[in-house]
Amino acid sequence: MTTFVDRVVVHVRGGDGGNGCASIRREKFKPLGGPDGGNGGRGGDVVFVVDPGTTTLLDLHRRPHRRAAPGSPGQGNNKHGADGADLLIPVPDGTVVKDLDGQVLADLVGAGTRYVAARGGRGGLGNAALASARRKAPGFALRGEPGEERDVVVEVKSVADIALVGYPNAGKSSLIAAISAARPKIADYPFTTLAPNLGVVEAGEIRFTVADVPGLVRGASQGRGLGLEFLRHIERCAAVVHVVDCAAAEPDRSPLADLAAIRAELAAYASLDLGGPPLHERPQLVVLNKIDIPEARARAEAAARQIADAPVFLVSAVTREGLRELVFAMAGLVETARANRPAPEPPRIVLRPPAIAEPEFTVRRRGSAFIVDGEKPRRWVAQTDFSNDEAVGYLADRLARLGVEDELARLGARPGDEVIIGGVSFDYEPGIRAGVGHPFGPRGTDPRLHAAAPPATAHWAGDGDDDSAARDEEDG
């Protein structure tokens, strides 16, 4: 029997972008072939896809770390690397994806619905794309960007039209087995059902789905008895059917007391706003069950006379008495809910242009170090191959054009001060004069880094203060 898993925390990471290629065309009778290094491929995305054949999150529970394929590196002769394949993760219909703070990221309903949980990194540019009038044959290429990485909470909420709720051992499983082809485990003890069971019911021309929710107890809305785990499975239901055990022999139990307790739990449950009314305000039916027992029939008839706020049905899942009337009443609620369901809105395209006055980077001081933050500086550092002096010089040029060096000088940075960008620590050396002059010299070198002034060095910062490279369009 398949284990039912309806909540799991998953670590997802998009594939890294492929590195660009630094290559020079070498061909007979072509003395100035020029750069021909191709770009790296884009990393694959991690995508959740609704699959009707998937009913549990067991596979994600067993393998909670998922990573998409990286992009291939570029090659010479202007060959671009292949994009990494997307990682498609099948999930059940009704899956909700949240962040660790509980914010809903996606509500996946309907076969084929997708959500990109982690995007792959963009591929680095090859030296052919970096060539310019000033740098005709770059001896370096850009590294691929790392893919997005995050932890997400994946939950399954049953997609059903009708929810059967009630105390443990109230006969909900017997009822769904009697009105549908579902065959849940049935036994004469509480909490036999530990996972929701779904059954398809037909009433005339109306076909609908019923969910048998595991038994609720007092305090379920606060999590007692795994109530929170069970209650979220009825958030999508259009109507609620209260199944009341009229044969319960406990001294503190009665049909009316059980009904009031379950209604109170539904009213106290703070469900997510999925577009429907609160659970206790949805259409309700009351089923007084087990009337095949003489004492239970007497209790049911007495309780039915005191319930005036919802239709009441006296049924027996064993003898099937009253089931036909109950099924058609359920179908009527489903038909009304479907008729009143608002038409889905077409997707809206929202354009959010960047604010003109928003700075592209910020510099703050922390002790004797300077922290440079911003999408472009972080991304540029992540793309730089620090084993290549020409690539380091290119980074210095980009930062200088952005105004980072001027801002450091304005804040009083001195030679040798630590500057951290994107998790990489640099020794500030204004004598390099980045951004000016022409870096003549062999490919892969930059004469400015070997001048009389002490060279700038870089190493990974150990404090992890800055985030990984952010995504943005390539600049120059």
UniProtKB/Swiss-Prot annotation:
Residues 61-85, 437-476 are annotated as: Disordered. GTP binds at residues 166-173, 191-195, 212-215, 289-292, 316-318. Residues 2-159 form the Obg domain. Its cofactor is Mg(2+). The keyword Phosphoprotein does not apply. Residues 160-335 form the OBG-type G domain. It comes from the Bacteria. Mg(2+) binds at residues 173, 193. It is found in: Cytoplasm. CDD domains: Obg. Its EC number is 3.6.5.-. Its main location: cytoplasm. Residues 353-430 form the OCT domain. Gene3D superfamilies: GTP-binding protein OBG, C-terminal domain, GTP1/OBG domain, P-loop containing nucleotide triphosphate hydrolases. Residues 463-476 have a biased composition (Acidic residues). InterPro entries: G_OBG, GTP-bd, GTP-bd_Obg/CgtA, GTP-bd_prot_GTP1/OBG_C_sf, GTP1_OBG_dom, GTP1_OBG_dom_sf, OBG_GTPase, OCT_dom. It is an enzyme of class 3 (hydrolase). One of its GO terms (cellular component) is cytoplasm. GO terms for biological process: ribosome biogenesis. Residues 450-461 have a biased composition (Low complexity). GO terms for molecular function: GTP binding; GTPase activity; magnesium ion binding. Monomer. An essential GTPase which binds GTP, GDP and possibly (p)ppGpp with moderate affinity, with high nucleotide exchange rates and a fairly low GTP hydrolysis rate. Plays a role in control of the cell cycle, stress response, ribosome biogenesis and in those bacteria that undergo differentiation, in morphogenesis control. Belongs to the TRAFAC class OBG-HflX-like GTPase superfamily. OBG GTPase family. This is GTPase Obg.
